[in-house]
């Protein structure tokens, strides 16, 4: 991706991007889109069966990212009700229009004035589905399988209730102090947190070898609370109790995020890493 900020750079970068696309993919086709520089990354979880039933399960804020990859997600977002309802209508209409059948996620960039722009639809379960499960009580993986088997949804939109607040931190084998560089190695200590409202999904274990060739995700630490403040407090505790040694991880980064004034106030955007002085 290239960002053009004036007519001159647009022409030059258009030529550069076409050349890069031709060299990498054998096709010089490129997309030109409006550049949204200060926005939130909001995504809606949808579930649709083979019988025409479609529901959404609320939205997640995935604005804290590095290299356009998500690091922290939370649900519900802090959208105002008007924006949330309008986007939800668009999501349900789009899902029905394409005849979608399964779990999926429709993603947007949202500006502070409520203007929102469609990014993509992920036609699969996502890493951050866990926090939606925590606030809705639904097992999304189970429903993905049941829908594929032809089962009918046992509920409609009126039955969906979002209760409380949930946050997910992706614990990656990366070094935040070195621009999130990969940190392969062997885990010499590995202990996950527990307690009320804490959920950890992880494949890692003591002695696990972190490869430099695959995704750096070691685990997903999720915290649930009746309120956002309680979820943040539980996440802080979970991060303090999560012990990983032998490789660098994003745990210290997440701990700073939980104390960052902008995050605590819910005032985060996709440029959070570039604009936050405390991170």
Predicted features by range, described:
Residues 3-279:
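ATP-dependent carboxylate activation and anion-phosphoryl transfer catalytic cores
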